[in-house]
Swiss-Prot record:
EC numbers on record: 7.1.2.2
Functional summary from the UniProt entry: Produces ATP from ADP in the presence of a proton gradient across the membrane. The catalytic sites are hosted primarily by the beta subunits.
Keyword Manganese tagged: no
Enzyme class per UniProt: translocase
Location(s), subcellular: Plastid, Chloroplast thylakoid membrane
Protein name, as recorded: ATP synthase subunit beta, chloroplastic
Cysteine pairs bridged by disulfides in the record: none
Bilayer topology term: Peripheral membrane protein
Length: 474
C-alpha cells in the first residue's frame, strides 16, 4: 500500500497565519488544505498560501489559532478545502469548510467539490444578454437584472434589504424553479441568526422538510478569523455552481457583504509579507476580486445571478475596495431611506438605481421608452418639490400640476406587497410580470388614469388591482 499521509509540524504562529515544516520533497501545493490537531479534538483546517523554501509553507487558518503551540502535528489532506453540494445542503447553515453549524445533524451528500475552481470556458458561456425577471415592478422596469449578471445592493440599516433579499429568493423558486445560496461574509452573527429565523417564518426554509427549502446558507461572520471570511464567498459560490452545472438550474447567489471579502484579504495580506498597495489594501486586490466574480456567470446549462451588498467605507466611492467591485457590476439597486420613511416598499430609489441592460436592443422599445418617461416624470417632480414646499402646489402651472399628480401615482405604483411580508402586512404578496408592469406605467403616464385617487396605486400588484381598489375607495 502506498503511504499517502504527508505529515509536518507547526514551526511559527503569527496570529491567523502559520508556518509549517514538511519533510524534504513533500511540500503540499498552494491552496492545499492541512489539518492541525487541537486540544479540543475538533482540529483546525488551514490553507497553504505560500511556499517559503527550506521545506516550509505559510498557511492561513480557517479557525482561531488560540491555544495552538509550535511543534503540533500538521497533516496534508492532499486536496483543497472541499464542501458538500446538492439538494441536501438546502435549508442548512454551513461554515467555510462545509460543516453544518445549525445543530440539525450531519449532512449526507453524494459529492463534495473543491472551493478553488476555474471559471467556465468561453465556449460554455451564454453570450446573448437576457433579462432575469424578478416579478418586482421597480426592479424589472427601471434597473433590470441580467441573467447571470452581478448586481450591487446599496442601502443603510432598516431600509428593507433583508426583506428584498427574501422576496427574490421566494420569486426565483416559484417563477424560475431555481434555488438560492446566501453567503454571509463578515457580517454580524445576530443578523445571520435573524435572517435564518425570518426565512423559517416566511417559508423560504422549511424546517420540517429541508429538501423543500429554497436556500442554502453559508456563514463566515465578523468574529471569525480573516481566513474564514476570505474564503466563505468561494464556499457559497461552489455550492451555487453545482446547482447551475449539474442540476442545470437558475441560481441566485447573495453575498453580504462583498466589502468584507476584500477587507479579510487585506488583513491576511500584510501577515503574508506582501507590500501593501493604495490605502493599505492587498496588492492582489483586483486578481482576488476577479477570481471570485468571473465564476459568477451564465452558461448554456444554467445561470448564477449574483446580488452583492456593497458597503462603501466612509461613503467614499473612489476607495479601492468598492471601486474594484463596481468594475464587475451589471446593475445597482439603491435603497432609499426617504422612500422607506414614506412607507413605499420596496424602497428602491428609481432615479439612483442603474442597469446596463436598460438600452434599446436588449429590452423592448416600449420597455425602454416607458422606463425613460417614468424617470423623466419622477425627476421633474423632484425638481418641483422645493417650490411646492415653499409656495404650495397651487402656484404651479397646470402642466406641472399634472406632472406632479402622475409622478405621485407612479411613485405609489412602484410599491408592491411582498409574499415574504404577508405575515407583517396582512396583504397577499404579488408577482407582477414585466408585460403587466409596462402596461400599468404606460396607462398612468398616458393620462388614462388621471381621475383615480393616488391611494389606489399604493401597495397593489398590477394596474387592474389599482383600478379595482379605486372602486372600493369611492
Amino acid at each position: 500500500m502506498v503511504e499517502t499521509t504527508n505529515k509536518g509540524y507547526v514551526c511559527q504562529i503569527i496570529g491567523p497565519v502559520l508556518d509549517i515544516e514538511f519533510p524534504g520533497g513533500k511540500l503540499p501545493p498552494i491552496y492545499s488544505a492541512i489539518k492541525i490537531e487541537t486540544a479540543d479534538g475538533i482540529g483546525n483546517i488551514v490553507e497553504v498560501q505560500q511556499l517559503l523554501g527550506d521545506n516550509k509553507v505559510r498557511a492561513v487558518s480557517m479557525r482561531s489559532t488560540d491555544g495552538l503551540k509550535r511543534g503540533v502535528e500538521a497533516v496534508d489532506l492532499g486536496a483543497p478545502i472541499t464542501v458538500p453540494v446538492g439538494v441536501p445542503t438546502l435549508g442548512r447553515i454551513f461554515n467555510v469548510i462545509g460543516e453544518p453549524v445549525d445543530e440539525q445533524g450531519d449532512v449526507v451528500v453524494d459529492q463534495t467539490l473543491p472551493i478553488h475552481r476555474d471559471a467556465p470556458a468561453f465556449t460554455e458561456l451564454e453570450t446573448k444578454p437576457s433579462i432575469f425577471e424578478t416579478g418586482i415592478k421597480v426592479v424589472d422596469l427601471l434597473a433590470p437584472y441580467r441573467r447571470g449578471g452581478k448586481i450591487g445592493l446599496f442601502g443603510g440599516a432598516g431600509v428593507g434589504k433583508t426583506v428584498l433579499i427574501m422576496e427574490l429568493i421566494n420569486n426565483i423558486a416559484k417563477a424560475h424553479g431555481g434555488v438560492s445560496v446566501f453567503g454571509g461574509v463578515g457580517e454580524r452573527t445576530r443578523e445571520g441568526n435573524d435572517l435564518y429565523e425570518e426565512m423559517k417564518e416566511s417559508g423560504v426554509i422549511n424546517s420540517s422538510n429541508f429538501a423543500e427549502s429554497k436556500v442554502a446558507l453559508v456563514y463566515g461572520q465578523m468574529n471569525e478569523p480573516p481566513g474564514a471570511r476570505m474564503r466563505v464567498g468561494l464556499t457559497a459560490l461552489t455550492m451555487a455552481e453545482y446547482f447551475r452545472d449539474v442540476n442545470k438550474q437558475d441560481v441566485l447567489l447573495f453575498i453580504d457583504n462583498i466589502f468584507r471579502f476584500t477587507q479579510a484579504g487585506s488583513e491576511v495580506s500584510a501577515l503574508l509579507g506582501r507590500m501593501p498597495s493604495a490605502v493599505g489594501y492587498q496588492p492582489t486586490l483586483a486578481t482576488e476580486m476577479g477570481a471570485l466574480q468571473e465564476r459568477i456567470t451564465s452558461t448554456t446549462q444554467g445561470s448564477i445571478t449574483s446580488i452583492q451588498a456593497v458597503y462603501v467605507p466612509a461613503d467614499d466611492l473612489t476607495d479601492p475596495a468598492p471601486a474594484t467591485t463596481f468594475a464587475h457590476l451589471d446593475a445597482t439597486t439603491v435603497l432609499s431611506r426617504n422612500l422607506a420613511a414614506k412607507g413605499i416598499y420596496p424602497a428602491v430609489d428609481p432615479l439612483d438605481s442603474t442597469s446596463t441592460m436598460l438600452q434599446p436592443g436588449i429590452v423592448s422599445e416600449v420597455h425602454y421608452e416607458t422606463a425613460e418617461t417614468v424617470k423623466e416624470t419622477l425627476q421633474r417632480y423632484k425638481e418641483l418639490q422645493d417650490i411646492i414646499a415653499i409656495l404650495g402646489i397651487d402656484e404651479l402651472s397646470e402642466e406641472d400640476r399634472l406632472v406632479v399628480a402622475r409622478a405621485r401615482k407612479v411613485e405609489r405604483f412602484l410599491s408592491q406587497p411582498f409574499f415574504v411580508a404577508e405575515i407583517f402586512t396582512g396583504s397577499p404578496g404579488k408577482y407582477v410580470s414585466l408585460e403587466e408592469t409596462i402596461k400599468g406605467f404606460t396607462m398612468i403616464l398616458n393620462g388614462e388614469l388621471d381621475d383615480l385617487p393616488e391611494q389606489s396605486f399604493y401597495l397593489v400588484g398590477n394596474i387592474d388591482e389599482a383600478i379595482a381598489k379605486a372602486e372600493t375607495l369611492k
